[in-house]
């Protein structure tokens, strides 16, 4: 009973941290590592920005250019991992997710400031070679903005502390009932 309550507290803390990352732009979980399976078959990691999180449904959203590698990779294999780390709290969340949908929302795109719209309006595809940073051309009429939506299937919570690190795993198939695992 004691450990079950402790596990519930850890899961609630994970949700609280993710919600805080949406509210507070300086929260460490705002930027996180997204890892997909590359088209060649190996891991492909990059930093992305958390744009949405629903603590009841365990769904997440990010924005990207629809021509990016991550979109191609997720279309081939919808599994991915998110790695969140807070250096001050010594807290890590490793979240296994599946892509559940993508939305090309003109409304969300138009709500962005021009400086943010640039991230989705380059005429060159992401990853293509250019001479220099000034050689990027933009076409604001032709945005490639897309919102990717994910559903969590597993969460690992790791808190580095003394005398004992805390590590727990929660899985959708167990109705998010967690278990402690060796750190």
Feature map (PLM): residue ranges:
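An N-terminal domain-cap segment
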Residues: 5-57
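Short beta-strand or tight-loop elements
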Residues: 30-32, 46, 78, 143-146, ...
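Short acidic, glycine-rich loop/turn motifs
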Residues: 36-40, 84-88, 159, 172
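Structured loops at beta-to-helix junctions and adjacent beta-edge loops in soluble globular domains
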Residues: 37, 65, 85, 151-153
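Short glycine/proline-enriched turns and hinge-like loops at secondary-structure junctions
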Residues: 43-44, 73-76, 160-163
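A short mixed-secondary-structure module that forms the rim of ligand-binding clefts
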Residues: 51-89
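Charged, gly/pro-rich active-site loop segments
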Residues: 91-183
């Amino acid at each position: 009973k004691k450990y079950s309550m402790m596990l519930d507290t850890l899961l609630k803390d994970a949700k609280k941290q993710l919600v805080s990352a949406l509210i507070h732009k300086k929260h460490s979980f705002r930027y996180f590592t997204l890892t997909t399976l590359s088209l060649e078959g190996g891991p492909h990691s990059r930093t992305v920005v958390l744009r949405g999180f629903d603590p009841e449904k365990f769904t997440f959203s990010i924005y990207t250019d629809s021509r990016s590698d991550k979109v191609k990779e997720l279309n081939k294999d919808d599994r991915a991992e998110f790695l969140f780390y807070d250096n001050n709290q010594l807290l890590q969340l490793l979240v296994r997710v599946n892509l559940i949908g993508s939305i090309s929302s003109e409304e969300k795109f138009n709500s962005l400031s021009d400086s943010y719209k640039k991230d989705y309006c380059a005429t060159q595809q992401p990853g293509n070679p250019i001479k220099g940073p000034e050689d990027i051309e933009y076409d604001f009429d032709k945005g490639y903005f897309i919102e990717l939506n994910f559903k969590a299937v597993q969460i690992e919570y790791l808190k580095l502390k003394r005398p004992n690190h805390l590590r727990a795993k929660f899985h959708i198939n167990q109705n998010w009932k967690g278990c402690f695992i060796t750190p």
